[in-house]
Swiss-Prot record:
Family matches, as InterPro entries: Ribosomal_bL9, Ribosomal_bL9/RNase_H1_N, Ribosomal_bL9_bac/chp, Ribosomal_bL9_C, Ribosomal_bL9_C_sf, Ribosomal_bL9_N, Ribosomal_bL9_N_sf
Lineage, highest ranks first: Bacteria, Pseudomonadati, Pseudomonadota, Betaproteobacteria, Burkholderiales
The family this protein is said to belong to: Belongs to the bacterial ribosomal protein bL9 family.
Keyword Iron-sulfur in annotation: no
Protein name as catalogued: Large ribosomal subunit protein bL9
Keyword field contains ATP-binding: no
Coiled-coil positions: none
Keyword field: Ribonucleoprotein, Ribosomal protein, RNA-binding, rRNA-binding
Job description of the protein: Binds to the 23S rRNA.
């Protein structure tokens, strides 16, 4: 199925690109989340009329994400978990825990925006974590996991 992208989609294209994707991907993800539209002649003509407005909205989202990223970049978040004597945690610190800790500091994030390349944190210490605020704005945050000896 051919679709017109209404915003930048990772590994697919940017605003205004007409791309071919599998029917299920378009029907179940891109179209319901308003990231794309079916590429019919009328939709293409309508898109060209609204193109400037959509580009302006995309630029505003990017500017807002960059402003939020400047505040968030280099921030250290402290999370306390129960741990054993050897420094290993009972349980782990997940992206949901980090998003919740950042929400406590006034940042509005979803857990999917917190990227943890090595998986959940299972030891006490400082760990680098990436936060994707926008497809073009990814900032680094340090998570300090503090052990609470039991």
């Amino acid at each position: 199925m051919q679709v017109i992208l209404l915003e930048k989609v990772i590994n697919l294209g940017s605003l205004g690109d007409i791309v071919r994707v599998k029917d299920g991907y378009a029907r179940n993800f891109l179209i319901p989340t308003k990231r794309a539209r079916r590429a019919t002649q009328s939709a293409i003509a309508e898109f060209e009329v609204k193109r400037a407005e959509l580009e302006k909205v995309a630029a505003e989202k990017l500017a807002a994400a960059q402003a939020e990223g400047e505040k968030l970049n280099g921030l250290t978040v402290q999370i306390t978990q129960k741990s054993g004597v050897d420094g290993r945690l009972f349980g782990s610190v997940t992206n949901a825990d980090i998003a919740e800790a950042l929400a406590g500091q006034g940042f509005k994030l979803e857990k999917a925006q917190v990227r943890m390349p090595s998986g959940p944190l299972k030891v006490v210490g400082d760990h680098p974590v990436s936060v994707a605020l926008h497809t073009d704005v990814v900032v680094d945050v340090t998570v300090a996991v503090l052990g609470e000896h039991v």
